[in-house]
Regions:
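Terminal RNA-binding accessory module
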Residues: 345-442
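Proteins enriched for Cys/Gly/acidic motifs involved in redox and nucleic-acid/cofactor modification
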Residues: 1-205, 244, 255, 259, ...
Length: 442
């Protein structure tokens, strides 16, 4: 009987793509993939180690399955991903119940590692070089069947002072364009209609191997693939958003008019301490240009409150900036000191309660903005991809071009006719909720 393997993948879409490649390798080698990890022989926890809350979630999940192992319900527990890469020695010491701690560079060895564990019952620790970049082979898509993420690069070279990603995943390494297009074509052939392009910094794509950003050319090539209806790009850095990129997004029908652009702050001093560029004036000018070049664009951003040294005045400026710009989508996080980063050693740390309260204030303001934008959407007609049927609410739900999977809101809608999952329908907006919309199929 084939060994049953379950995967629990935590964290960001980039981590999810890694998990899908591992699942494919396991399936190809004869392992049985099970959706309920608690019913497996071997559990892989693909961890996130980005901020404190993510690390705690990963540890809690590992301990949960180690308990099942002690009860005899599963045979082995393996940790992969960012936390395993970052805290390899600590995890081996503090969680001896783990059968393997597998670094990011060794994901391709996962089948051999499982065989070794089951044969010898000896703990395994495996780490490959973080300079390697291999995403060959297929994937087992773990998202809803009609959309998938495609990772166009690994690592990061921006070296923001608050971020540990470069030390975990190495320097930025772009994939060859032909490899990305080949994988995208495979996804389209397997029923994916919405492609979501991801990397730590998508706008840097190609600089390391082609000598310049090739994101516009890559997006153009992806638009030529039959089968995709929507193509969405996440994680664009403001200083690398060029006129060429904006022109491509405006021109290509398959490219949704949606731009995810994490700015983190608007104060020049804070941004400089973060090792980021720009200030309120340059960001305002960029956003004005984006909205002029791409009418009806949906702008998403993320902010950090309580970064070391942030004064009340600088925070108030950030609040005013949010009110002025009126981002369509916004997420805000209280600064989390990360071990080994320069910002962790800054002396002027803001108290946790102040960091968290400032994040709450930003999100309260965004709620007002969201309410206003939703009210303006009343009586409009939008194209919606049906994601499923909400049996509790007795209606369908889906997303529009303005809503990225997993992070943005939903559109709930009634229909006299049966609507299939993955079907794209026209919906008239009749009512609003905090971040969601309610409508009826036309």
């Amino acid at each position: 009987m084939a060994t049953r393997v379950g995967m629990v993948s935590l964290g960001c879409p980039k981590n999810q793509v890694d998990a899908e490649h591992m699942l494919y390798d396991l399936h190809k080698e004869g392992f049985q993939i099970v959706s309920d990890a608690a019913l497996s022989d071997v559990v892989i926890i693909n961890t996130c180690g980005f901020i404190e809350s993510a690390k705690q979630e990963a540890i809690d999940t590992i301990l949960e399955f180690c308990t099942l192992k002690q009860e005899g319900r599963i045979k082995a527990v393996i940790a992969t991903g960012c936390l395993a890469e970052r805290y390899r020695d600590e995890m081996k010491k503090e969680i001896p119940e783990l059968d393997a701690v597998v670094g990011i560079g060794s994901n391709g060895k996962i089948c051999d590692i499982i065989r070794e564990i089951l044969l010898d019952k000896q703990a395994v620790c495996s780490y490959g070089a973080k300079t390697e970049l291999s995403m060959e082979g297929g994937r087992i898509i773990s998202t809803e069947p009609f959309y998938a993420y495609i990772k166009i690069a690994e690592g990061c070279s921006n070296n923001c002072t608050y971020c540990a990603i470069p030390s975990i995943r190495g320097k930025y390494r772009s994939r060859r364009m032909e490899d990305v297009v080949k994988e995208a074509r495979w996804l389209a052939e397997n029923g994916v209609t919405e492609l979501v392009v991801v990397a730590q910094d998508t706008t840097r794509y190609g600089e390391d191997i082609y000598g310049k950003s090739m994101l516009p050319e890559l997006l153009t090539a992806l638009c030529e693939i039959d089968g995709f209806k929507w193509i969405r790009t996440l994680y664009c850095y403001p200083e690398r958003i060029t006129d060429e990129l904006l022109d491509v997004i405006a021109k290509e029908d398959k490219l949704v008019k949606y731009l995810d652009m994490p700015i983190q702050h608007c104060d020049k001093t804070i941004l400089k301490r973060m090792n980021r560029r720009g200030d309120r004036e340059t960001l305002t000018a960029l956003i004005k240009k984006i909205r002029e070049k791409i009418p009806n664009v949906t702008l998403r951003t993320t902010l950090i409150t309580g970064f070391p040294g942030e004064t009340k005045e600088q925070f108030e400026e950030l609040c005013e900036f949010v009110k002025e710009i009126r981002f369509e989508r916004l997420g805000c996080f209280a600064y989390s000191p990360e071990e080994g980063t320069p910002a962790e050693k800054f002396e002027d740390q803001v108290p946790l309660k102040d960091r968290e309260r400032r994040a709450e204030i930003i999100m309260e303001e965004q709620m007002i903005i969201s309410d206003s934008l939703n009210e303006a959407a009343l009586d409009s007609e939008v194209e919606v991809v049906c994601v499923g049927l909400d049996r509790y609410a007795e209606c369908y739900y889906g997303r529009s071009q303005a809503d990225a999977p997993e992070i943005d809101g939903k559109i709930f809608f009634l229909s006299e006719d049966k609507v299939r999952v993955v079907e794209y329908v026209k919906v008239k907006i009749d009512d609003t909720m905090d971040y969601d919309l309610i409508g009826s199929k036309m």
